[in-house]
């Protein structure tokens, strides 16, 4: 995982003049929107003193015993004016394996899950993304990114990021990703910007782009492991008992999928409802609503990425902390987890590691 940074107003909208995702690099002589992002970590102590009811501290036996921490961020040497109430939020990048299968989930099935949750008693009330007009003229439901701001992979986090993160141009993204205010500031600094205005030379051919998308959609999900072990089976029972499956919906059936027809009508188990949930004020970034992240493959993070940092801003250093950061709609599950025995907490985590 890496970070994306957002310079925004209190309501989550971008500060005027800044791109949706902050860019801190520029090819000389151009000057970036900011020289960098400063991240500071803060201690968090809950109302129980970071201890379970049995007296065991959170993260018992680890170097982080008894602690929970969360990050805040600010920009270093911003180029453009900032309002007094500006904020900087950081969000972790989202793994792109398995996203082709998620793309194949029907919009109507996600809406059906939303309606099911709204009809139920209890705190879990996920909300879907907005309907988005796609470049091909269709209207699709937003389901990708932490705030469901992208509807399809074709116009989604991986494909679009080639342009609005790295500024690689192609036929359907011919212009530099920048704001008029940034361009005007470059002129004020005496920098020749004539080469930036208007369509640019295509750096990525459409054939190369399509090849990339085949790879992107085809990234496989690692198989679940050890599901027949008694502790893992017991952990799965606890996962359901604690209500975790209320948001981390285990199973979907894909619909028709023209980009990769072989993905159609498959039963998949990503453990996400593809909806956004209120995770409490302590988890506020651009908002306090976050899409439920898929859990498949998370148990292999340490082997594949050499870390186990999770959550929208990577504040959770492992599965235990990820559960303990569940507030808002999910706080009742957090409380049930806290009241498990040491053995049961370990069994639940063993199940998560098996996915």
Residue ranges and their predicted role:
Residues 1-355:
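Periplasmic c-type cytochrome electron-transfer domains
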């Amino acid at each position: 995982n890496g970070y994306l940074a957002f310079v925004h107003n209190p309501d989550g909208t971008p500060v005027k003049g800044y791109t949706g995702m902050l860019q801190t690099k520029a090819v000389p002589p151009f000057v970036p929107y900011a020289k960098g992002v400063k991240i500071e970590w803060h201690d968090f102590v809950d109302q129980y003193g970071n201890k379970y009811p049995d007296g065991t501290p959170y993260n018992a036996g680890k170097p982080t015993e008894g602690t929970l921490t969360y990050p805040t961020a600010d920009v270093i040497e911003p180029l453009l004016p900032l309002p007094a109430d500006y904020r900087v939020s950081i969000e972790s990048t989202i793994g792109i394996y398995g996203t082709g299968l998620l793309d194949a989930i029907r919009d109507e099935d996600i809406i059906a899950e939303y309606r099911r949750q709204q009809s139920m008693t209890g705190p879990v009330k996920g909300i879907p993304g907005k309907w988005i007009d796609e470049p091909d003229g269709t209207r699709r439901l937003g389901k990708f990114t932490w705030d469901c701001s992208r509807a399809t992979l074709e116009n989604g986090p991986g494909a679009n990021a080639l342009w609005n993160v790295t500024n690689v141009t192609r036929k359907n993204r011919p212009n530099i990703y920048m704001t008029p205010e940034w361009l005007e500031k470059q002129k004020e600094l005496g920098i020749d910007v004539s080469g930036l205005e208007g369509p640019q030379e295509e750096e990525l051919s459409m054939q190369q782009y399509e090849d990339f998308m085949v790879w992107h959609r085809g990234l496989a999900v690692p198989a679940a492991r050890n599901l027949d072990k008694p502790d893992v089976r017991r952990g799965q029972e606890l996962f359901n008992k604690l209500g975790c499956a209320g948001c981390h919906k285990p199973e979907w059936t894909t619909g028709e999928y023209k980009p990769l027809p072989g993905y159609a009508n498959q039963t998949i188990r990503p453990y996400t409802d593809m909806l956004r949930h209120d995770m409490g004020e302590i988890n506020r970034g651009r908002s306090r609503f976050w899409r439920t992240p898929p859990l498949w493959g998370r148990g292999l993070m340490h082997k594949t990425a050499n870390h186990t940092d999770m959550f929208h801003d990577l504040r959770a250093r492992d599965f235990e902390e990820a559960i303990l950061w569940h507030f808002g709609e999910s706080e009742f599950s957090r409380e049930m987890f806290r009241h498990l025995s040491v053995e049961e907490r370990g069994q639940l985590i063993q199940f998560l590691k098996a996915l």
